[in-house]
Amino acid sequence: MEVNEGQDTEGGSSRAQTLTPPPNPQQQLYDEEDLLRESMDTTEKTFENGFQIQKEQIRQHLQDSSQRGTAEDAETQKMKQFLDTNELHNMASDSWAMMREEIMEKRETNRDLNRQLKEKSEELMQKSQILVETTLKLKAVEEERDKRKKEEQFREADARSNNYARKDHGYKMHNIELKNEYTSTTYRCRYICRCALKPCMFNMTLVPEAHTPSPTQLYRMYCIMEKSGNRKIDPKQLMAMSSRPLPSPLQITLPDKMMDNLFKDMIGCSSLWTYVAELGWENSYNRYVDKLLNENCGDILNGPGTMLILADGLRLEDLPVSTKNCFVCTDYDEETLIALQKKCCRERFKMIVLVIPFTIDVELVDCWNRLIAKISEETKILVVSNMTPDELEDHALLVEFTSILQKCRRVDDGYLEIISLHDRLEAHPRKTLEMTALAGKVEYWKAVQTRAKEVGMEWKAFELKRCTSDTPVKNSDCEASTSMKSASTVRTFEDRMVKRGNHNRVYHHFTPYGRKK
């Protein structure tokens, strides 16, 4: 028991020693100063008391000697001297001054130590503050890392799951790669859309009773209907057949019309555009949406586009082209030119098609150039001649007209392209626009549109009028038929070529600048 108590005592003392706070250097300086001051006070009191006692003893000895009447001896003389002088007091003063100087030195040392201690404490506070801030940042980084790790785990779990009853099913991919047993091909299946909270249900247009939340299954239904020739199939059987990857004969690429029907069935899904690329439908979907935009907002998206300018002597009824933007020049006066300039500045057309009538009047070139000068530099100009089969009879006039047409110029740095009758199409190198004009005005303007596209002036808004005949019948022939004349007056294209004889061989020797020599 005693040993245990001793052990407990030693353990308690060791614990007490470990719990003892470290000594404070400033407090030690204060304690030393107090001890020094107490020792000085004690020494001073002791010295004063001893001095007073000796003084009293000497005084008493002198009194006794005087009473006895004895002569003063040498010792008595020294005592008197000692009493008369302040030697002892001076000694005490010197010792006191030395002790005071020592105390002042201690105080200066104490002040220096206090100053250093204060600086060290401030530095320690700054470092501790930096340490706290670093700890907080490290803690925030660790929390962010843990958060991302949990999100990744959550996504991986969602990607592996196919539970439609979960509340967070809208964020799951639901992509499962299956291997077809027939062709060993890997398929990507999507069994649900990405809409939040509730998946979309797709109803098939061809079979309204067949419905599914899976875009892949809906595509399989359309493949089955396409290969079966849209025969009548039971909806439940259709859903059962499309519930797994189809055999090889039924794996087809749907045509654009069937893909349009597919997107019509799925157009109510707001997240459709987010997963069409995964299923390989991105191009078809973009084509379908672009088609709808052009049909409903084409005039807004494409802008004004192209304007048709008819020179003096032409009417819109003379052309088989249908256009919303048309400017007919009835005259070349200043008022007409200003009106044309205002319209071009207001609408800002990308391209202008200037249609020139067939003429050999050289003075009209200046009028056409005045029209061209009123068009802004940013607008492209395409100069086209309006030809009819009657105007192609005299080839010499055609050569002169072609040379006149080549004189159209722009005073600015804008782009200008002239389509001549001698131009050839890239698809038919042996066929010129003149030969196309002999086949009819509709074929001629189609060739003009093709030639414009070849030279980089694509006429996007090009559209022909409805119920336009391609038969190359002359106006005089129509009048003859209406006036009950003989039907033999109507000549066909072959008759006209027979009448011209060998003129078609001489035709190739002409250029827009005259006959070759």
UniProtKB/Swiss-Prot annotation:
This is Retrotransposon-like protein 1. Residues 1-29, 142-161 are annotated as: Disordered. Keywords: Hydrolase. The gene is retr-1. One of its GO terms (molecular function) is hydrolase activity. Its EC number is 3.4.23.-.
